[in-house]
């Protein structure tokens, strides 16, 4: 429960922080900031994500006590990569001071981007260690501290020094400070670094994580390339419009999806450990039903409340383009979430992850074709359509690999069909209400949408959610006295 609370807090505060920074920087500088942030995320994925995946999969409370050399090896690997990236940042900063000492220079922003990647990697790695040990309280505190430092440092920096490079550095500092504050709870007893054993383990970790990292890097490169394409085709203001819509949408989907994944994937891993591969794949089938049943209505509901959110929380300079880009990006964001949290676990359990890379490459290719064709037909909005088409193509390929062939998975078609029908019915009811007065529209759409979809879930027990709710919150029967 603490993990879910942490994700809710993180999502809400990230939304607030993104809006504050967008308002203080303005569309053009926010576009530069978003582009650099996307670059930092890509760097983090390429260099540090395998450590996070390995910690989540192979580190535990038992390993912490019985095999401390695993943590020692992971720490050393992070330290080596971080030092190299800091050295690169120092080189860029030094060249920037010699060539163009202004904070708007490309070298300055590149240096800040590298340091931001180090900060993101440091936080994500330690958060994964806390989750792997199932210490929810420690994880919750870590997230809270990160957001407190983020709000104070990043919002304060954007107010006093409204330039992307300083806000990026403030973000890196916020993530590092959260780890420093929680260092006692996250610390393990010193482990002996055993070179040969650690090398074997790191090879295992790399073999497990690299295919997933490659796919994630491709998916993160797509919006990075697309933001650059919009800036080149129009200007940085247009890139800022696109970035805000993409960032707010992706944060919502990824927060819910990641919270589900933390709970559901571990159930599949546990099923494999205790009952074998067949039981694990049966659990994956149930997980897919749950993920679709929760993400699909969220996608539909987000579209329904977009006009109200635009008027109530989006800075005035971004209004208009925000609603347009959001509507075009939602299908792609939904497809990406389905891949990450419903389809990828199939291949993770099987430890055959090449289809994940193939799907990502197809998505990138479709996105590239769209970039070449659609902007001439639709203007900058065509770039958002290209991104959604690329992600939809990737999801279709991955689903096809799961559904066909000798190892095809039995899909929960009943749950998927009922979720789709209920979401469509909800959209039909909410669509006429979208353009009411914003506060009224938001209140009615959220309340009515939850009530309608929740009623269908309850009546038909979609994905077993009714049973889960009654087991979790139902009244406990009194135990008879012996």
Model-found features: residue ranges?
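Signature of the first transmembrane helix
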Residues: 1-52, 89-92, 116, 151, ...
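Helix-loop junctions and terminal segments of transmembrane helices
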Residues: 48-65, 131-132, 245, 249-288, ...
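Membrane-proximal transmembrane or re-entrant/amphipathic helices at the cytosolic face
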Residues: 428-482
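Membrane-water interface segments that mark the loop-to-transmembrane alpha-helix transition
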Residues: 1-14, 36, 45-97, 110, ...
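Hydrophobic alpha-helical transmembrane segments
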Residues: 107-114, 140-190, 208, 246, ...
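Interhelical loop/hinge segments that connect adjacent transmembrane helices in multipass membrane
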Residues: 137, 164-166, 180-223, 263-282, ...
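Membrane-interface junctions at transmembrane-helix termini in multi-pass inner-membrane proteins
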Residues: 119-142, 331-362
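Interfacial segments at transmembrane-helix termini and the short loops linking adjacent helices
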Residues: 96-112, 302-334, 338
């Amino acid at each position: 429960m603490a993990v879910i609370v942490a994700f809710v807090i993180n999502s809400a505060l990230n939304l607030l922080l993104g809006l504050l920074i967008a308002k203080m920087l303005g569309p053009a500088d926010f576009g530069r900031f978003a582009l650099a942030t996307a670059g930092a995320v890509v760097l983090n994925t390429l260099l540090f994500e395998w450590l996070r995946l390995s910690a989540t999969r192979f580190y535990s409370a038992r390993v912490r006590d019985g095999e401390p050399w695993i943590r020692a090896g992971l720490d050393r690997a992070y330290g080596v990569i971080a030092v190299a990236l800091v050295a690169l940042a120092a080189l860029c900063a030094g060249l920037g001071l010699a060539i163009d000492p202004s904070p708007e220079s490309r070298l300055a922003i590149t240096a800040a981007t590298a340091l931001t990647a180090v900060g993101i990697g440091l936080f994500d790695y330690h958060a994964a260690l806390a989750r792997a040990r199932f210490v929810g309280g420690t994880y919750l505190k870590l997230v809270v501290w990160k957001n407190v430092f983020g709000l104070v440092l990043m919002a304060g920096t954007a107010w006093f020094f409204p330039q992307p490079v300083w806000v990026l550095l403030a973000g890196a500092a916020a993530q590092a400070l959260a780890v420093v504050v929680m260092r006692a709870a996250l610390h393990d007893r010193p482990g002996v670094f055993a070179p040969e054993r650690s090398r074997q383990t790191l090879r295992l970790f790399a073999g497990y994580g690299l295919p997933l990292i490659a796919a994630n890097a491709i998916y993160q490169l797509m919006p990075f390339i697309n933001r650059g394409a919009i800036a080149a085709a129009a200007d940085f203001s247009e890139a800022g419009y696109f970035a805000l819509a993409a960032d707010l949408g992706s944060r919502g989907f990824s927060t819910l999806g990641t919270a589900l994944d933390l709970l559901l994937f571990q159930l599949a891993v546990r099923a494999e450990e205790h009952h074998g591969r067949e039981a694990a794949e049966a659990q994956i089938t149930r997980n897919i039903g749950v993920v679709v049943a929760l993400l699909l209505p969220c996608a539909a509901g987000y579209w329904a409340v977009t006009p109200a959110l635009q008027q109530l929380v989006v800075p005035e300079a971004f209004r208009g383009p925000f609603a347009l880009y959001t509507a075009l990006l939602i299908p792609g964001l939904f497809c990406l979430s389905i891949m990450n949290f419903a389809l990828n676990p199939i291949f993770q359990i099987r430890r055959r992850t090449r289809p994940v890379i193939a799907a990502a490459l197809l998505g990138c290719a479709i996105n590239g074709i769209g970039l070449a064709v659609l902007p001439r037909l639709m203007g900058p909005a065509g770039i958002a359509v290209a991104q959604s088409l690329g992600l939809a193509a990737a999801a279709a390929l991955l689903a096809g690999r799961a559904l066909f062939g000798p190892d095809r998975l039995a899909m929960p078609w009943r749950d998927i069909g009922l979720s789709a029908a209920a979401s469509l019915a909800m959209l039909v009811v909410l669509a006429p209400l979208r353009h009411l007065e914003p506060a009224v529209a938001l209140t009615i759409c959220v309340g009515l949408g939850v009530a309608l979809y929740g009623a269908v879930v309850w009546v038909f027990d979609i994905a077993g959610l009714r049973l889960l709710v009654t087991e979790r919150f139902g009244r406990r029967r009194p135990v008879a006295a012996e």
